Regions:
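Intrinsically disordered, low-complexity Ser/Thr/Pro/Gly-rich interaction regions
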Residues: 280-328
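Conserved phosphate/anionic-ligand binding catalytic regions in large, soluble enzymes, centered on
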Residues: 103-105, 167, 279-282, 328
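N-terminal core-entry segment
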Residues: 1-270, 313
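Glycine-rich phosphate/diphosphate-binding loops and the adjacent beta-loop-alpha structural elements
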Residues: 269-282
Length: 328
């Protein structure tokens, strides 16, 4: 029987400690850290950030992982609060193919576990690179069918109503945590399979506090999945490919094949990008166009501006009269 996707990803996880990443990859990972931490600190005073942080601290759980600008708690709860902050302004970095924001849940999980275990930044950096690569590659896997054509798995997932940051972010957070916890290959398989069955996050929640919570829960569940597996928890190793599993549940109108998936350290980071505007990237081009026209039309009356957009844009960011920045 051929290896499952979870088994191949687990092998990539356990070999993380033996890798020497290129300076270019390390620099990209550092930029992701700076971007995530910057937007998270910028969002620390937002109502959603305060609510989630206070809720996490109300558990009274003891640990050495710090909520940004706040107190210490367990790794899972710190990851929950910090990844929620990181996505609260919709300003965190994003992938070009699978529409996901992986740095927030992945760095939140990696930093929380590393702090709790008193591990150095280089080790946390390697864990982040490993986790990011796994989720990015899975999100980019081509899926399709006769009626719909071929698209990336992450794009089809979003079209079906699932938030890729939530679903894929759980896997990257799990992988990063598993690296730092020193999970065996069998434990890493079970950690990823556990994270896969926890997946969720609905795009109908966009425009509310629930959207940044998707990122927070992805980070929290990733840490918890790795912790459970490290203590002997067993899940389904074939969960990604099996009927009723990850692929068939999140993209029901297409066939997804993970047979040829391979992971290359840091390769997917080159497709990461940093947002110029704090809103969904689907409308960044329209903002650019408006800015280009601003000077030319500054002194002329404008009654109406019409923009052509994809159908999914109207569903995800189509709020003509937003009342909060969460609706961007």
């Amino acid at each position: 029987m051929s290896e499952t996707l979870a088994e191949r990803a687990a092998a990539f996880i356990v070999n993380a400690k033996n890798r020497n990443h290129s300076p270019a990859v390390v620099e990209l990972a550092k930029r992701c850290l700076v971007d995530w931490m910057g937007v998270a600190i910028g969002a620390s005073g937002e109502p959603v950030s305060r609510t989630v942080a206070l809720s996490a601290l109300a558990w009274g759980a003891q640990g050495e992982a710090r909520i940004l600008l706040g107190d210490r708690t367990t790794p899972a709860l710190a990851a929950l609060a910090n990844a929620t902050m990181g996505h609260a302004l919709d300003f965190d970095d994003t992938r070009g193919h699978a529409p996901s924001h992986l740095s927030s849940p992945t760095w939140s999980a990696a930093l929380a576990v590393a702090q709790h275990r008193d591990m150095d930044g280089v080790t946390a950096l390697s864990a982040f690179i490993t986790g990011y690569e796994i989720s990015a590659v899975i999100g980019d896997v081509l899926a399709g069918g006769e009626d719909i054509g071929t698209y990336g798995f992450g794009n089809l997932m979003q079209g079906a109503g699932f938030h890729p940051t939530s679903v894929l972010g759980r896997l990257s957070a799990t992988a990063a945590a598993a690296v730092l916890m020193g999970c065996s290959q069998e434990q890493a398989v079970n950690a990823l399979a556990t994270a896969a069955t926890m997946g969720g996050g609905l795009t109908a929640s966009f425009g509310t506090m629930a959207k940044p919570l998707h990122s927070g829960k992805a980070a929290m569940d990733g840490v918890q999945a790795a912790e459970l597996a490290a203590r002997g928890f067993i899940a389904a190793p074939e969960v990604f490919e099996a009927p009723g599993g990850f692929a068939s549940a999140f993209v029901q109108t297409a066939t997804t094949k993970f047979d040829d998936v391979t992971f290359s350290p840091g390769e997917s980071l080159s497709d990461n990008s940093f947002k110029p505007y704090a809103c969904g990237k689907l409308i960044h081009g329209h903002i650019d166009a408006a800015r280009d026209l601003r000077d030319e039309w500054a002194e002329r009356p404008v009654k109406q501006i019409r923009c052509r957009v994809a159908e999914i844009s109207t569903r995800l960011v189509g709020r003509p009269l937003p009342t909060t920045h969460l609706e961007g």
